[in-house]
Curated annotation (Swiss-Prot):
Signal peptide: none annotated. Homodimer. The active site is at 365 (nucleophile), 394 (proton donor). It comes from Picrophilus torridus (strain ATCC 700027 / DSM 9790 / JCM 10055 / NBRC 100828 / KAW 2/3). Its EC number is 2.4.99.16. This is Alpha-1,4-glucan:maltose-1-phosphate maltosyltransferase. The keyword Zinc does not apply. The record marks 452 as: Transition state stabilizer. Belongs to the glycosyl hydrolase 13 family. GlgE subfamily. GO terms for biological process: alpha-glucan biosynthetic process. It catalyses: alpha-maltose 1-phosphate + [(1->4)-alpha-D-glucosyl](n) = [(1->4)-alpha-D-glucosyl](n+2) + phosphate.
Amino acid sequence: MDPVAIENVTPEIECGRFPAKIVVNSKFTVTAEVFRAGHDLVYPVLMYRKLKKRWRSVAMKGTGNDLYEASFTPDEPGIYEYKISAWKDSYGTLIRNINAWLGSNEDVEQDLIEAINLIKDAYKRSSGNDKKIIKRYLDDLINSDLNKKVMILNDNNFSSIIKKYQKKIDKTDYRTLRLIADPEYGGYGSWYELFPRSIGNFNDIIKHLNYVKSMNFNVLYLTPIHPIGITNRRGKNGSRISDKNDPGSPWAIGNDSGGHYSINSDLGSLEDFKNLLRSAREKNIMIAMDIALQCSPDHPYVRDHPEWFYHRPDGSIRYAENPPKKYYDIYPLNFETKNKMALWNEMKNIFLYWISNGVKIFRVDNPHTKPLDFWEWLINDIKRDHPDVVFLSEAFTRENLMFELSKRGFTMSYTYFTWKLTKGEITEYFKKLYSYPYNFFFRPMLFTNTPDILGRDLSMGRNEFIIRSVLASTLSSLWGIYSGFELCENDRLDDTEEYLNSEKYEIKRRNFNSDNNIKDIIARLNSIRDEMPALRSGKIKFCETDNDKIIAYARYNNENKILVVLNLDTMNVQSGFIRVPLNDFSMDLNSIYDVHDVLNNNHYKWSGEYNYVRLIPGKRQAHIMVIKNA
């Protein structure tokens, strides 16, 4: 039986079953309702530590209605633990009562003696500089008049020291919870995806880094770099018929020259790859590696470990299936095979091998088709020794399954952003993602396009590419584009979401200086993201507008306040009034304030909540405004 109630602790993911997440060097705030019967005060503290290190504590502050909060800041990546302990606040209760009795002209002589006894008791438990401070105050108390005694007893600094050492009567502990502190690139990143073979080889990609950097991307994501299978190789646009010139899908991994530990010889050697990693780091670009845990029919695993695959009634190995389609160039692995731990350990070793060669970011293909307990085991095991490694879940599946993968360990996740087009759809979706508890375990990665997905809205041309860029880069701290987006490529295969002449099945040579590109806009968006802390870690508030073709939302934190206003119409000028969330900005409703549109480099003077905007497609599609007091 617990004499102190500790309830509604946040964040707490599924009663502590899963850890919360934060980015290193970010303040982590814990709140809880803490109370006890009667009129006695409680003294709750937040205990925290990095796993296996010494516990630290910070007193929780009351914010009203039995709600308390406290914070700590993880200063390095890794697993942390936190919990709340609380006990009767004997000293605080007594001082509160003394103040009340004095206000009613009651005699408090015996109560002052009791207070001094509590201080003497705390003195015995104290140490170091705290002991010296208590001794000094105690001497003053004994030799002071009533008014001076009351002033000393109410001194906040002195009180906090006494409460720290007072006897912990009715001490109650809440269960221990976990927190994952990820490196900054696990929570903030601007990604550029490319097919290495379309650039040439690793040395050619090194030369291409300046192009990626010119748009201010800080993560270069490479599609699989392994040998590609020959058997049942797919041809142009995914055709089952191929010829000798078809390079095949990079996701059909493995041939006679090796599998997941090997590099396609057309791209270069392992040393060439490591040189790419070094060259990218020199430009403050990280390399993200694509890991697809599946095999071509030519993968060495098929020969050496046929028991790792699914078998049909006739004994043949089952191809990958996603009804109504079958993928004859890929064999899925059976993660529930009889001796599954041999397979699981081999899969873990693949990640560990590339980690040993310098990779810290993994984009994992189709994780939702593998067991949840496999991912929880693998990621937790890897991050225990490599807390600076992060995992992106490429799962376009049921929402609950996407959330569960993040709970089980994935650092960040693809989203439904591609299919959220209207003001209502965008608002509803991101309100959910930024609400509790999702905001403590699910980090949305907003890709504008992928090799598999050419959004139907992008058929509307350049202005729509700008719209999606602004949305993706400002709605989340994580966003990315697949190569060609900056060139506004939108040739579609029939009435599908697939690209015509898909790069998945052919080598594509691009003119990266073609007309009609939006490279400068993307570069500016990424630059703004780097400059504005609120776009990296701020809260979000969707704003009222009187025009459904205009969406507006604020991103804000203690460092800056951003207002994004966007015309969702690619063809027509749209105008209207937006309601600036001045209350959320801690600004007076009658404020006059400076507005700097950092996207278009314009300055305005606004006043009050409601202000007028006029957005012109092709000229001024959006505002990204920094709000400052005049």
